[in-house]
Amino acid sequence: MPKTSVWKTRVGTQILMGKITDITQIGIDRIPCAQVRCQMNEFNIYLKKYFARSFDFWALDKTSLGNIGDTVLIKQIDGSSRPKANVSHAVDRVVFKFGNIVDPVTGRKIFNDTFADEIDLKKVLVEEVVDKPLEEESMLFEERRALQIRRLEQEKEANV
């Protein structure tokens, strides 16, 4: 039984996924490195629950693949290819670019949990259904509302 109630994870650090938090250059040769924050689980034996804990790893980024905020895959490197003792990994590839979220199933771009093409469609429908009746003068609210409902029903029938 350990002295603490927290067990460290048994998952190795050979390959990890995390976000780039800092990019810098080290040494006289100005080797580009990235600080990658990876989450690992720790098990609390008293609560019988896993808790996520963040760890920072320095990784070589020789080809300057990532920018701050990108989600990257890092692999552990052997001691002979390390420029410094605290640089233990190398950036393998960029998994997700920051700000460029694409649904992996459909391949469509996403903004705040909504597909980009659906946002464009809503914008067009609002212009056709809501804004055009408001441009007409001398109509009462009820008449404008009835015209908006008719146009919305016409759009529904046209798209079905």
UniProtKB/Swiss-Prot annotation:
UniProtKB keywords: Mitochondrion, Ribonucleoprotein, Ribosomal protein, RNA-binding
Any one cellular-component term (Gene Ontology): mitochondrial small ribosomal subunit
InterPro entries, per the entry: NA-bd_OB-fold, Ribosomal_uS17m_metazoa
MF terms in GO: RNA binding; structural constituent of ribosome
Record flagged with keyword Metal-binding: no
Localization (cell): Mitochondrion
GO terms of biological process kind: mitochondrial translation
Major localization class: mitochondrion
UniProt family annotation: Belongs to the universal ribosomal protein uS17 family.
Cross-referenced PANTHER family: 28S RIBOSOMAL PROTEIN S17, MITOCHONDRIAL, SMALL RIBOSOMAL SUBUNIT PROTEIN US17M
The name this protein goes by in its record: Small ribosomal subunit protein uS17m
Source taxonomy: Eukaryota, Metazoa, Ecdysozoa, Nematoda, Chromadorea
